[in-house]
């Protein structure tokens, strides 16, 4: 049999009151923080993704696809000129 690592068994941790006191606060807090991050629109700003109402402009109502890989830069310039 191999030696003990000196750590507490996982079953002892899960049945301890201290574990549940700490995690009953942190788990809901993480959920609320994530919900606020997305619902306030901060996630769009941090990651630079367009908001749902910015995918299509008034002039361009088609999907902005790059179709020619050799002229992709020119197509990107055309697609993003109104932004």
Curated annotation (Swiss-Prot):
Signal sequence interval, chain numbering: none
Alphabetically ordered keywords of this record: Chloroplast, Electron transport, Heme, Iron, Membrane, Metal-binding, Photosynthesis, Photosystem II, Plastid, Thylakoid, Transmembrane, Transmembrane helix, Transport
Gene Ontology biological-process entries: photosynthetic electron transport chain
Subcellular location: Plastid, Chloroplast thylakoid membrane
Membrane topology reported for the UniProt record: Single-pass membrane protein
Transmembrane segments: 21-35
Record flagged with keyword Heme: yes
InterPro entries: PSII_cyt_b559_asu, PSII_cyt_b559_asu_sf, PSII_cyt_b559_CS, PSII_cyt_b559_N, PSII_cytb559_asu_lum
Cofactor binding annotation: With its partner (PsbF) binds heme. PSII binds additional chlorophylls, carotenoids and specific lipids.
Gene Ontology terms for molecular function: electron transfer activity; heme binding; iron ion binding
Pfam families in UniProt: Cytochrom_B559 (PF00283), Cytochrom_B559a (PF00284)
Gene Ontology CC entries for this record: chloroplast thylakoid membrane; photosystem II reaction center
Residues engaged in binding heme: 23
Keyword Phosphoprotein among UniProt keywords: no
Requisite cofactors: heme b
Family per similarity comment: Belongs to the PsbE/PsbF family.
Quaternary state and interactors: Heterodimer of an alpha subunit and a beta subunit. PSII is composed of 1 copy each of membrane proteins PsbA, PsbB, PsbC, PsbD, PsbE, PsbF, PsbH, PsbI, PsbJ, PsbK, PsbL, PsbM, PsbT, PsbX, PsbY, PsbZ, Psb30/Ycf12, at least 3 peripheral proteins of the oxygen-evolving complex and a large number of cofactors. It forms dimeric complexes.
Function noted in UniProt: This b-type cytochrome is tightly associated with the reaction center of photosystem II (PSII). PSII is a light-driven water:plastoquinone oxidoreductase that uses light energy to abstract electrons from H(2)O, generating O(2) and a proton gradient subsequently used for ATP formation. It consists of a core antenna complex that captures photons, and an electron transfer chain that converts photonic excitation into a charge separation.
Name assigned to this protein: Cytochrome b559 subunit alpha
């Amino acid at each position: 049999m191999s030696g003990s690592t000196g750590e507490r068994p996982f079953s002892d941790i899960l049945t301890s009151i201290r574990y549940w006191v700490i995690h009953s606060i942190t788990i809901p807090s993480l959920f609320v923080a994530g919900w606020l991050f997305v619902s306030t629109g901060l996630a769009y700003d941090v990651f630079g993704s367009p908001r749902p109402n910015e995918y299509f402009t008034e002039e361009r109502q088609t999907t902005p696809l790059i179709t020619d890989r050799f002229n992709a830069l020119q197509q990107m310039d055309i697609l993003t000129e109104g932004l």
